[in-house]
Amino acid sequence: VIGGDECDINEHRFLVFLTXASGLACGGTLIN
């Protein structure tokens, strides 16, 4: 997991498209 944590996708709905399109876990690299 890129962000170092497992994320609840329901808490990160705005990242769903990022996760699906880029394969990022919770958009960790984008958040950081």
Swiss-Prot record:
The keyword Chloroplast does not apply. Contains 6 disulfide bonds. Its EC number is 3.4.21.-. Expressed by the venom gland. Its main location: secreted. The keyword Secreted applies. Keywords: Disulfide bond, Fibrinogenolytic toxin, Glycoprotein, Hemostasis impairing toxin, Hydrolase, Protease, Secreted, Serine protease, Toxin. Monomer. Cleaves a kininogen analog with the release of kallidin (lysyl-bradykinin). Completely cleaves fibrinogen Aalpha chain, partially cleaves Bbeta chain and has no activity on gamma chain. The molecular weight was determined to be 58 kDa with an isoelectric point of 4.4. This is Snake venom serine proteinase. It comes from Bitis arietans. The lineage of its organism: Eukaryota, Metazoa, Chordata, Craniata, Vertebrata.
